[in-house]
Amino acid sequence: MLKNIKTYNPLSDYNKVIKKLNNNGVRPTKQRMVLTKLLFEKGKRHVSAEDLYTELRKEDRRISLATVYNTLKQFTKLGIIKEVVVDQNKSLYCNNNKSHYHLYIEDEGKVVDIPTENINLDLPAFPACLNLHNVDVIVRVRTLKDIIKN
């Protein structure tokens, strides 16, 4: 007998994005929907604006790099994706909207999701006038071979 197997349904994410755009007064233009498809059709991932632009070019889509950046910025502001700043010159965009942290493997330039229950955080008490909005954690590691070289 088969147990419940969770399968990834990119159409679900696609429909959620359309709804979120409409709820925030943002038109789901063809360009936004092409980028949405690209962001979500391959499952959970971390991708740069340049990587998305390259994927668009391979599909012969005519969307400028500036439009890619603007759309990613807008999607981040709306909470559709998260920006993961891995260094001062590079951001990756995460399409996993469940609460989680990130592991950044510096020498590989790779980001991996870490479930929140795998990291314990002790946060200070906040004044009553403040409300905790979000906690971003990026754990930075290097592979042992990279450490030995340095």
Per-segment meaning from a language model:
Residues M1-E41:
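Intrinsically disordered, low-complexity serine/threonine- and proline-rich regulatory segments
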Residues K77-N150:
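Non-DNA-binding regulatory cores of transcription-related proteins
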Residues K42-S48:
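Short capping segments at the starts of secondary-structure elements
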Residues V68-L78:
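Basic amphipathic alpha-helical segments that dock to polyanions
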Residues D51-L56, V68:
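A short acidic, leucine-rich amphipathic alpha-helix
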